[in-house]
Amino acid sequence: MEVRAMVREVRVSPQKARMVIDVIRGKPLRDALAVLQVLPQKTAPIALKLLRSAAANAEHNYDLDPDRLYVKRIYVDEGPRYKRWQPHARGRVGRKWRRTSHITVILDELPEKGAPRG
């Protein structure tokens, strides 16, 4: 049973968010939570909160055991860009893009050992 959670329009660029997200992809839930607690990047607490939310959804809505969950898929999509202006010399203006991200995580149960694949 797949469980999905999503956070939208996070004020961090997708490129920087993917650096953190790539670290936890495919890991068991406990390991992913432990890794995110020690990472210094701005995205780490956001991803940590998202993983905890997905685990709570799995436990509360689907009666899944959190100890048997792993990060099946996690990805970052680009959100809307905020356009800002920065003054330059001679009265000119430069455009700055404030990038945002959408982060999606899909958790699934670990397959049992000896269970047939299908």
Swiss-Prot record:
This protein's UniProt keywords: Ribonucleoprotein, Ribosomal protein, RNA-binding, rRNA-binding
Superkingdom in the source lineage: Bacteria
Gene Ontology cellular component annotations, sorted alphabetically: cytosolic large ribosomal subunit
Pfam family, one: Ribosomal_L22
GO MF, one example: structural constituent of ribosome
GO biological process: translation
Keyword RNA-binding: yes
Description of how the protein assembles with itself and partners: Part of the 50S ribosomal subunit.
Function: This protein binds specifically to 23S rRNA; its binding is stimulated by other ribosomal proteins, e.g. L4, L17, and L20. It is important during the early stages of 50S assembly. It makes multiple contacts with different domains of the 23S rRNA in the assembled 50S subunit and ribosome. The globular domain of the protein is located near the polypeptide exit tunnel on the outside of the subunit, while an extended beta-hairpin is found that lines the wall of the exit tunnel in the center of the 70S ribosome.
Protein family: Belongs to the universal ribosomal protein uL22 family.
Protein's UniProt name: Large ribosomal subunit protein uL22
Originating gene: rplV
